[in-house]
Amino acid sequence: MNKKTRIAITGPIGRMGRMLIKEIQNNKHSHLTVAVVQKKHQLIGQDIGRIIGIGEIGVLISDELNIKKNDFDVLIDFTRPAGTLEYLKYCNKFKKNIVIGTTGFSKEEIDIIKSYSQKIAIIIASNFSIGINLLFQLIKKTTQIIGKDSDINILEYHHRNKIDAPSGTALEIGEVISKVMNWNLNQDSIYYQKGITGIRDAKKIGFSIVRAGNIVGKHTVMFSSCDEEIKITHTASNRMSFARGAIQSALWIHKKNTGLFDMTDVLSL
């Protein structure tokens, strides 16, 4: 009988943290053993299951990851860049693998993550949904066929509380397109604003961003020529698809030694 993968969750009280815990509890191959919050959080010592409304599960909220080093196999982190880098230090010190869903990293921070992947195994993804990762493949193929003849625009929609823009997923879509077209995403992007913007440059990716209400996530990529237009859209109805993908990633990376991976590795795309 295979042992369950023991998982630690950071930010367990947030929306994504709650979804992750519920999915872990429903997955026969995983087991929640650690729930980590910031120092001096008012809920430290309380049962996380009771706090998120699923009843007591025997896991007490803690702010001390180091004393829990023998209690988990993989850490899942959906917090903020500064917090993620601190958790990476712990994982590196105790040789624990990590799944990172945090977005908004700078190039320098990504380089730090890459350096840690020489010592532990890391999965980092802007979006853990199976659907969005299939979308990446569709975008790649479409760009290969009609990219040079199209104006390409990415439209992304998220809830009003999302703090980074464009979304990590939108930027990853942009990277997929840029690699095919041999463009530099940082230099070849348009972020629409008011005023006289001039004629649209054909060799650019346009980004449009909406923050409103409780939108979980919607991404549309438009390929527009003078004769026709193709739209490819992915809409997330809830966050459970992200949670399932993150748990699947944790199970996949459990026995890995070192390396930097993403969802294309997990899904064998």
Curated annotation (Swiss-Prot):
Gene: dapB
One Pfam assignment: DapB_N
Function field: Catalyzes the conversion of 4-hydroxy-tetrahydrodipicolinate (HTPA) to tetrahydrodipicolinate.
EC number: 1.17.1.8
Entry binding sites for NAD(+): 11-16, 101-103, 125-128
GO biological process terms, semicolon-separated: diaminopimelate biosynthetic process; lysine biosynthetic process via diaminopimelate
Family annotation (PROSITE patterns): DAPB (PS01298)
Main location: cytoplasm
Chain positions recorded as (S)-2,3,4,5-tetrahydrodipicolinate binding sites: 159, 168-169
Name of the protein described by the UniProt record: 4-hydroxy-tetrahydrodipicolinate reductase
Catalytic-site annotation from UniProt: 158 (proton donor/acceptor), 162 (proton donor)
InterPro entries in the cross-refs: DapB_C, DapB_N, DapB_N_CS, DHDPR_bac, NAD(P)-bd_dom_sf
Top-level lineage group: Bacteria
Key words, A-Z: Amino-acid biosynthesis, Cytoplasm, Diaminopimelate biosynthesis, Lysine biosynthesis, NAD, NADP, Oxidoreductase
A GO-annotated cellular component: cytosol
Similarity field: Belongs to the DapB family.
SUPFAM superfamilies associated with the record: Glyceraldehyde-3-phosphate dehydrogenase-like, C-terminal domain, NAD(P)-binding Rossmann-fold domains
The protein's annotated pathway: Amino-acid biosynthesis; L-lysine biosynthesis via DAP pathway; (S)-tetrahydrodipicolinate from L-aspartate: step 4/4
